[in-house]
Each structure stands twice: as structure tokens, then as C-alpha cells.
From Swiss-Prot:
The lineage of its organism: Eukaryota, Metazoa, Chordata, Craniata, Vertebrata. A lipid is attached at residue 711 (GPI-anchor amidated glycine). Residues 23-357, 366-706 form the Transferrin-like domain. This is Melanotransferrin. PANTHER family: MELANOTRANSFERRIN (PTHR11485:SF21), TRANSFERRIN (PTHR11485).
Length: 736
């Protein structure tokens, strides 16, 4: 008995390793089952091996489950189903379909407009849209998914149909007539010549399918059509038979590109919304891909040409379309990199992520982390205000002791979201694996919340030096622990290897790197003397090097004054500092005569730049705050909630009973969000903490953090980096 069991085990193991002695193809309908059985018979009569068996499922999703459960082996799926099968069940694509020799195993989803219009990808809100059909790949899934993923379209509560109906100024989406939003989504549809079949997902609707969506645009019903890359060329320049297209010329239409530009309809390879992968045969990870391809390759060699007894790539005999394989398939090819991510490609993957929102799996609450009594009060009012407006998911407020405690609780799944500053975003991402879900946008002229850190010098050809020659120079800093004056420049110099602290003593290392400095601090008595050497105190010479306005070289303007008056050679300040104190903007005697053109910036690449070139020549950009969540949280639902909420509560003068970006009613500042916030914004492509913070800021931060010593930390989480240094114990520094 034991030998028989061992033999059976070996047999099953060999069967699994070799992909089994037969291939069980899963079908999703009766017609497909019939075609599969005919293909099985044709293969058998031709002597093809292994044997092909047919297993009938109820749908493509059901077939995927059967394959995962080892009750079937293979099925052909479209891109969206491949994504789900790979992500949820670990299936892999092994054989791809080829439709067009020019583009191979893919085609392209494009957005088409009339050349005479001024529509771009950034101005689609409010325009009229034409779609091939509801849930169609290029007409719905890709454009809607792309708009959501890029942050152009916000979706609350996973209600994609509602979001689209409110985003466009009317649409024709054949098949949307049975939805709650048919008034908007079917507004442009016309039906057939007798007015029948309006908004049907069938040829009864004249604007259905690729040609129909393009006709919707061509006839002026819509402003943009979401179609395939070949649609325009197939229906213009005399290539179309229907009368509506006889006079159309391809040169009268253009494509919308992802970067906001437009291009000729022939330039679809670089101007498109996404490359759409061809359908592919998927199997379990343990299935021999070579065996599957060899069987299908022998099959297509015998049964893909006219006159053969069985037609692999035709469904006409069964009264259906695209059974087992797409009817437009020219050939099947093996897939080299057998992962769903590689097959689908980044553009299509991003579009699918934008659509991955199941209302039935949406948590009823978003648990927000709060850190103080005033913040608890504001969060409670926010929860009530959101609930009254039926915003989803609802807000729950959960207290924590510190930003780091919030991060721990979010990672553990006990809390869902918290707004953090730049340094804490770095910790949340690097240590706890959190990701940004939304960010804060400050006013364009906001000089305290969004700025670049720059190194300013005098324009002097006789004494010109670069960032590589800072050693031995005299430096001016707004204050110890300030982001622009200390954390970023010192962190950058450490990261670049110019400053090399010993035994974590950054203060001494900075003092030795520069010849002399002015770095105002709260308690200069316990401080390296070289860091106060350039400070001058007040008009009477008192309060020298103190971290307040009594020191004339304190703050950004003070550090710039230190440079102006010749005390220092370089000033580390915000990019706005030069303009605040030159060209008549500062009437104080020391600044009244200054001109901005007399100052330059030191660039990290060793060059110098004009003061107005700060965006390209800076040490780092201070990032805005961001809402951080777990990676398994749907960031589009978080932003969708905040975006809908700010329409109601974002204006500080709104009459709806709550102000998202104002904390004055709670006797606090920057509660839940910074009070300077103008709007919550989507993260777009900045989906990791590194992307959000930017490489220069991360480098500076990590340069500083590399000097942390165990047991040296005394500051509370969220404080500036330098309380971790032995000589700075006890200093209370402001956060970013």
C-alpha cells in the first residue's frame, strides 16, 4: 500500500512538473465550449500532444479560480483580467496574440480631438466625450483609469460612473443607459436612423464601437473621442464606406499627449494614453510554458489558414466573436518575461490601478490620526460635517502620542491616515513603508510653506568660487535647526562628502569646515565658538548669536544681511530672500540700495546661476505636507474624499459649517492640515515617499540622519534633526 502511495505521489509530481499529460482549457460560455471541443478533436485527429481537454466555466473570473485550484490549466484573457489573475491568483501569461505586424502584441489607446479645437489632456474637465462603450478597454477602462491615476479625475466612494458623469460635460458611453447616471453618460448618443437603440452597447447605437466613437467626434456631438490608434486612419482620407466619413481628412484631427501637448494622428507610438497589451494565454506558475506554446504553435501551423478543417482564429461558425482567441489574431507567440507586470507594461498597469476600486470592499471608515486636544475637536467636527454631506468613507478620529506613534498604528492597521511634514514623511516611508495618498498645495506666493533652499553669493569675478570650494569660506545661516539654513545645506554637504563628522559631532565638523560662521541658536553658551564668530548681536552689540531677532543676522533676511555686509561669503536661505531684500523691497538702510542682479546662486553641479534661476539651481525643494497611508489603502478613495470635501469646506469663507484649512476656531495652528493649504492635491506619479520628497531633499535628510547616534536622541518626533547631536541636547527646534 505504501509503495502504491509513493508511486501515485511520484506520478502526480511528474505530472505537475511537466505541465500534466493533457492541457485542460477553460471556456466561459456554451459557444466557446463547442469551439473548444472542435479544436480538441482537430488536434487529436492531427496527432498533436499533449491532449487538449475542455473544462466549462461560467465566466472568465470563474475560469481563473478553476485554474488556481488545479481544476483547469489555461485560458486566454484580456489585459484587465490578466491583471486580476496575476495579482490575485499568481497566474502568468505564456502565449500572446499578434493582431498587426506593425505594433506586434499590443495596440494603443488614444484620445482624439479636432485640430481646430484647443483641448488638451489638462483641459478635459467639462468637455463632451465619446466612448466606444462602457467597460471597453480603449473607450473606457484606459482613459478613465488614466485620468484617475494621474489625479485629473477624483472618485469618491469608488463611484466611478458618478465621477465621470460629473467630470465631462456630457458623454456617449454606449451601455451606460441602465446606470443611475444615464442622463449624462448617454446625453450625446443618437441611436439608429429611426432613433431606436439610443445608448445601446450594440451597432444600433451609431456612436458605438471604435468607428462610432470617432463619428461622435467628427459630427460635432463630442469634443474628444477615446479610440484605438488606427481608428482615425481607418475612417478618413476616403478609406471609409459610410457617407458620414467620406469627406473626413486625417490631417484635421490630432492626438492628446500625456504631457499636455498634441501630435499628428500618425504619431500614436509616442503620443497615447497607454499601450494596451494583446490578449494572452495564462496558466499557473508551475505550468510548463514551453509545453503550452508547442501545442498551440503546432495547432496554428495546421489550423490558421483558409481551407483548413478547423479555424483557430475564427468564431463565425459558432455565431459569436472572439471565442478562445480574438478573431483578429494573426498568430500566437511565446512570451519571454512571464509576469503580468511585464506583459501589461507600466502605462496600462497605472490605468488599471486607477480603476481598482470595489465599492463592496471599501471600508466604511477612514481612521484619522490626531495628536492633541484641539486636533481631536477639529477632527470630530470634520467627521460630522463630512457625514452630513454623505461623503464616503466616513471619518473616525483616533488619538496617538506622536507622529511616530501614528506611523506605528497605521502600519499595524489600527489607524489609516495622518498628515505629516517632510522629515516625518521620510520616516513614515523608509521605516514604516507608508505611501503618500494626497498632498497640500499652498498659494503661489506663499513664502513659508513651499520654497527652494539656495546658497547665495555675491557676483564677484575676482573672488568667484563654486559649491566645490566652500571649505574655508565664511558662512551665514538663518538659525540652528532651520530647514533652509541648517538641515538641508549641512545635510547636503555631509551627503556629498565635503563634511565628515567624527563621533556624530556635526557641530564641530561644520565649525571646522567653514572658516567662521553665524548660526544663531537659543543657547549659544554651550556652542562651538566658530559658529557664532560672524554674529553681531543687536545695535549695542548685546545678544550676540541668540536665536531671535535681537541678533541682526538671525533669520533669512539676517543671513542675507550677513553676506551683504561682508561678514560672510555665502548665505544659505530660502529662494525668496534675495527678492525680499533687493530692488526696493526692503527700505531698511542696509538693503535699500541692493540689486538682485548683484547676487548669484551656487549650483550642486559646480556652476553658478542667476538669482531667478532658483528652480534649476538649488540645494533642495522643501516638500509640502502629505497624507500618508498603508500601501494596501486605495489612495484614490482618500484623495476622492478630500477633493469632494474641499469643494464644500476648503474655502475659509464657506457657509457650510466647517473649514478644512483653518484652525483658528480651535485655538491652534495647522490642525489636521496646514492652515496655509489652498487645496488638497493628488500625488499623481509621486507615489512613494522618495518621489514626494524629491532626490535632493532625501539626500540632504539622509546625509544628516547618517550622523545619528544611538542614545543621543532627545528631541520629540517631528522636531528638527539636530537635537540628536551631543552638543545640542535640550534645544527645542521647530519642525519643518
Amino acid at each position: 500500500m505504501r509503495c502504491r502511495s509513493a508511486a501515485m505521489w511520484i506520478f502526480l509530481a511528474l505530472r505537475t512538473a511537466l505541465g500534466s499529460v493533457e492541457v485542460r482549457w477553460c471556456t466561459a460560455s456554451e459557444p466557446e465550449q463547442q469551439k473548444c471541443e472542435d479544436m480538441s478533436q482537430a488536434f487529436r485527429e492531427a496527432g498533436l500532444q499533449p491532449a487538449l481537454l475542455c473544462v466549462q466555466g461560467t465566466s472568465a473570473d470563474h475560469c481563473v479560480q478553476l485554474i488556481a485550484a488545479h481544476e483547469a490549466d489555461a485560458i486566454t484573457l484580456d489585459g484587465g483580467a490578466i491583471y486580476e489573475a496575476g495579482k490575485e491568483h499568481g497566474l502568468k501569461p505564456v502565449v500572446g496574440e499578434v493582431y498587426d505586424q506593425e505594433v506586434g502584441t499590443s495596440y494603443y489607446a488614444v484620445a482624439v480631438v479636432k485640430r481646430s479645437s484647443n483641448v488638451t489632456i489638462n483641459t478635459l474637465r467639462g468637455v463632451k466625450s465619446c466612448h466606444t462603450g462602457i467597460n471597453r478597454t480603449v473607450g473606457w477602462n484606459v482613459p478613465v483609469g488614466y485620468l484617475v491615476d494621474s489625479g485629473r479625475l477624483s472618485v469618491m466612494g469608488c463611484d466611478v460612473l458618478k465621477a465621470v458623469s460629473e467630470y465631462f460635460g456630457g458623454s456617449c458611453v454606449p451601455g451606460a443607459g441602465e446606470t443611475r447616471y444615464s442622463e449624462s453618460l448617454c446625453r450625446l448618443c443618437r441611436g439608429d436612423t429611426s432613433g431606436e437603440g439610443v445608448c445601446d452597447k450594440s451597432p444600433l447605437e451609431r456612436y458605438y464601437d471604435y468607428s462610432g466613437a470617432f463619428r461622435c467626434l467628427a459630427e460635432g456631438a463630442g469634443d474628444v473621442a477615446f479610440v484605438k490608434h488606427s481608428t482615425v486612419l481607418e475612417n478618413t482620407d476616403g478609406r471609409t464606406l459610410p457617407s458620414w466619413g467620406h469627406m473626413l481628412m486625417s490631417r484635421d484631427f490630432e492626438l492628446l499627449c500625456r504631457d499636455g501637448s498634441r501630435a499628428s494622428v500618425t504619431e500614436w507610438q509616442h503620443c497615447h494614453l497607454a499601450r494596451v497589451p494583446a490578449h494572452a494565454v495564462v496558466v499557473r506558475a508551475d505550468t510548463d510554458a514551453g509545453l503550452i506554446f508547442r501545442l498551440l504553435n503546432e495547432g496554428q501551423r495546421l489550423f490558421s489558414h483558409e481551407g483548413s478543417s478547423f479555424q483557430m482564429f475564427s468564431s463565425e461558425a459558432y455565431g459569436q466573436k472572439n471565442l478562445l482567441f480574438k478573431d483578429s489574431t494573426l498568430e500566437l507567440v511565446p512570451i519571454a518575461t512571464q509576469t503580468y507586470e511585464a506583459w501589461l507594461g507600466p502605462e496600462y498597469l497605472h490605468a488599471m490601478k486607477g480603476l481598482l476600486c470595489d465599492p463592496n470592499r471599501l471600508p466604511p471608515y477612514l481612521r484619522w490620526c490626531v495628536l492633541s486636544t484641539p486636533e481631536i475637536q477639529k477632527c470630530g467636527d470634520m467627521a460630522v460635517a463630512f457625514s452630513r454631506q454623505r461623503l464616503k468613507p466616513e471619518i473616525q478620529c483616533v488619538s496617538a502620542e506622536s507622529p511616530q506613534h501614528c506611523m506605528e498604528q497605521i502600519q499595524a492597521g489600527h489607524i489609516d491616515a495622518v498628515t505629516l511634514n517632510g522629515e516625518d514623511i521620510h520616516t513614515a516611508g523608509k521605516t514604516y513603508g507608508l505611501i503618500p495618498a494626497a498632498g497640500e498645495l499652498y498659494a503661489a506666493d506663499d513664502r513659508s510653506n513651499s520654497y527652494f533652499v539656495v546658497a547665495v553669493v555675491k557676483r564677484d569675478s575676482a573672488y568667484a568660487f563654486t559649491v566645490d570650494e566652500l571649505r574655508g569660506k565664511r558662512s551665514c545661516h538663518p538659525g540652528f535647526g532651520s530647514p533652509a539654513g541648517w538641515d538641508v545645506p549641512v545635510g547636503a554637504l555631509i551627503h556629498w562628502g565635503y563634511i565628515r563628522p567624527r563621533n556624530c559631532d556635526v557641530l564641530t565638523a561644520v565649525g571646522q569646515f567653514f572658516n567662521a560662521s553665524c548660526v544663531p541658536v537659543n543657547n549659544p553658551k554651550k556652542y562651538p565658538s566658530s559658529l557664532c564668530a560672524l554674529c553681531v548681536g543687536d545695535e549695542q552689540g548685546r545678544n550676540k548669536c541668540t536665536g531671535n531677532s535681537q541678533e541682526r543676522y538671525y533669520g533669512d533676511s539676517g543671513a542675507f544681511r550677513c553676506l551683504v555686509e561682508g561678514a560672510g561669503d555665502v548665505a544659505f536661505v530660502k529662494h525668496t530672500t534675495i527678492f525680499d531684500n533687493t530692488n526696493g523691497h526692503n527700505p531698511e538702510p542696509w538693503a535699500a540700495h541692493l540689486r538682485s542682479q548683484d547676487y548669484e546662486l551656487l549650483c550642486p553641479n559646480g556652476a553658478r546661476a542667476e538669482a531667478h534661476q532658483f528652480a534649476a539651481c538649488n540645494l533642495a525643494q522643501i516638500p509640502s505636507h502629505a497624507v500618508m497611508v498603508r500601501p494596501d489603502t486605495n489612495i484614490f478613495t482618500v484623495y476622492g474624499l478630500l477633493d469632494k470635501a474641499q469643494d464644500l469646506f476648503g474655502d475659509d469663507h464657506n457657509k457650510n459649517g466647517f473649514k478644512m484649512f483653518d484652525s483658528s476656531s480651535y485655538h491652534g495652528r495647522d490642525l489636521l492640515f496646514k492652515d496655509a493649504t489652498v487645496r488638497a492635491v493628488p500625488v499623481g506619479e509621486r507615489t512613494t515617499y522618495q518621489d514626494w520628497l524629491g532626490p535632493d531633499y532625501v539626500a540632504a535628510l539622509e546625509g544628516m540622519q547618517s550622523q545619528r547616534c544611538s542614545g543621543a536622541a532627545v528631541g520629540a518626533p517631528g522636531a528638527s534633526l539636530l537635537p540628536l547631536l551631543p552638543l545640542a541636547v535640550g534645544l527645542l527646534l521647530s519642525s519643518l
